[in-house]
Regions:
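Rhodanese-like catalytic fold shared by cysteine-dependent sulfurtransferases
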Residues: 1-19, 23-57, 66-103
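Short, surface-exposed ligand- or partner-binding patches at beta-edge/loop junctions that are enriched
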Residues: 61-62
Length: 103
């Protein structure tokens, strides 16, 4: 698993086909989500992740990057190869002057 900065994520979103997954709780997502992300709460990851393509590029994020790092390790243990964690989560994303969108 590779840890990436908000700037690196912004570049990946513009250039590559990646799967961006917000693993925060429902009440946290009400504040906004990174455009292009899907919301899969961490509590559902163990059920959802095994059905996904392990060869795709996956970026996980949460509030500050702790929960998403745990999800990245789960993905790695399932054989996923291209896993990224947004260091600092949405806090770092917003502090870097990137926006969240409302669902």
């Amino acid at each position: 698993m590779e840890h990436i900065t908000p700037q690196e994520l912004s570049t990946l979103l513009r250039k590559n086909k990646i799967n961006l997954v917000d693993v925060r709780k429902d009440h946290e997502v009400k504040q906004g989500i990174i455009e292009g992300a899907i919301h899969i709460p961490m509590s559902l990851v163990n059920e959802w992740l095994p059905a996904q393509n392990i060869d795709n590029h996956w970026v996980f994020y949460c509030h500050v990057g702790v929960r998403s790092a745990k999800v990245g390790l789960i993905a790695k243990n399932l054989g996923f190869k291209n896993i990224y964690n947004l260091s600092g989560g949405v806090v770092a994303w917003c502090q870097s002057d990137f926006e969240l969108i409302k669902l």
